[in-house]
Design a protein with these regions (language model features):
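Residue-level detector of conserved, well-ordered beta-strand and adjacent loop positions
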Residues: 12, 36, 83
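Short, charge-rich amphipathic alpha-helical segments embedded
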Residues: 3, 20, 24-46
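Collagenous Gly-X-Y triple-helix signature in extracellular proteins
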Residues: 47-212
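Alpha-helix N-cap/N′ positions at the starts of helices
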Residues: 2-10, 18
């Protein structure tokens, strides 16, 4: 009891000093007073501290989304791969296929600008995956309407988004080959109908999914 009280008091001091990383680690797993609620309350600040120190190639956790398809135990933290860092802003991509959605719900010619997937990512997914504090950390950026280098298709107009898909150009830039681009899907995504190639798996043996 005395040890827990000492750790709790130190965590409170760290929060007051804005040392959220140390405070989080002190509160983690603690069952004392309101330690669980206090840890939850500093989650955005803790993530910000980790994100500030993240480098290209690191994995970071940010936001939460149903992944194990066991809704009774709540959402799981989302794991992201850092692709680029500039002026303390990170470009990240999910390590796993999180859901299965159509690019567009109707069979018509459409670009990223007008597809239903763009709306779903920036509305449904955005509000489901991130808390208010986390949303405040996600900037709106210009997504350039780059022409597909392999197909003569109309790219549409550039957009302003918070969540978006990598373009073919970006996928080729940040991942050198198809093997590096292999991505496994979550149990939740599989339950929602994601296509998984059982003959092509990730290093951990998870069936690869189509994501770009």
């Amino acid at each position: 009891e005395a040890i827990a009280a000492s750790k709790y008091d130190r965590a409170v001091e760290c929060i007051a000093a804005q040392d959220y990383k140390t405070a989080w680690e002190l509160l983690d797993g603690m069952e004392y007073k309101d330690s669980g609620e206090k840890q939850k309350s500093i989650k955005p600040q803790y993530y910000r501290a980790l994100l500030t120190k993240a480098a290209v190639g690191d994995t970071v956790f940010f936001g939460s989304y149903e992944q194990d398809n066991e809704t009774s135990n709540g959402k799981e933290d989302i794991e992201w791969l850092v692709l680029a860092k500039e002026n303390n802003r990170l470009l990240v991509v999910s390590q796993y296929g999180l859901d299965c959605q159509q690019y567009n719900t109707s069979e018509t010619e459409v670009t990223w600008e007008n597809c239903t997937l763009r709306e779903w990512l920036n509305e449904d997914f955005f509000h489901a995956a991130f808390s208010d504090g986390e949303k405040a950390m996600i900037p709106t950026v210009t997504v350039s309407a780059d022409k597909n280098p392999d197909c003569d298709t109309e790219p549409g107009e550039s957009t302003q988004d918070k969540v978006f898909l990598l373009s073919v150009t970006e996928a080729n830039r940040y991942f050198k080959n198809g093997e590096e681009r292999v991505c496994g899907s979550t149990a939740y995504a599989k339950a929602n109908g994601v296509y998984a190639a059982n003959d092509y798996t990730t290093e951990s043996g998870v069936a690869a999914c189509w994501w770009w």
